[in-house]
Amino acid sequence: MITLYLARHGETEQNLAHIFQGQMPGRLTALGRQQAADLGERLKAIPFDSLLSSDLTRAYDTVEIAFGDRHLPHYTTPLLREIDWGSWTGLAITPERSLAMRPADAESDAQLYERAARFITYLKQHFEGQTVLAVGHGMINRRVIAQIEGLPLERVKEIPLFTNCEYRRLTL
């Protein structure tokens, strides 16, 4: 069994600018850094064995700010990266380019859902019996939850969105 605390990164400059951040590194704002510190405070009593994050800067920095003083192993994986928005990466979110749409060169919902399944396989192979914190991103996190709960892709939208530095406790 794995006890997974799945969280989203802190607020970034790109979140504030309302752009398609996707797989850009991202830079935490002052508020995002405070959110990360608060996450560490909220979870200070949890005896984590390992810390995980996507390999994108905003997720990595969130873990380091929240838990860097614990001196636990911090692993990164591209499996937890946010959706790849393709040619929309770095562009403003507008009515003509909304989060509900995708350009032809973006990662599809099915591809993102499959990547979430690969992340769960990775967890089971490397972290069995552990309590793990994993910091990812809004869209991938919802698909990870769907995979753990056995929900089909069509039902992912039923899973509430993550706010910055929100976490959810899951067991697998």
Language-model-detected regions and their locations in the chain:
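Short active-site segment of divalent metal-dependent hydrolases/proteases
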Residues: 12, 140-141
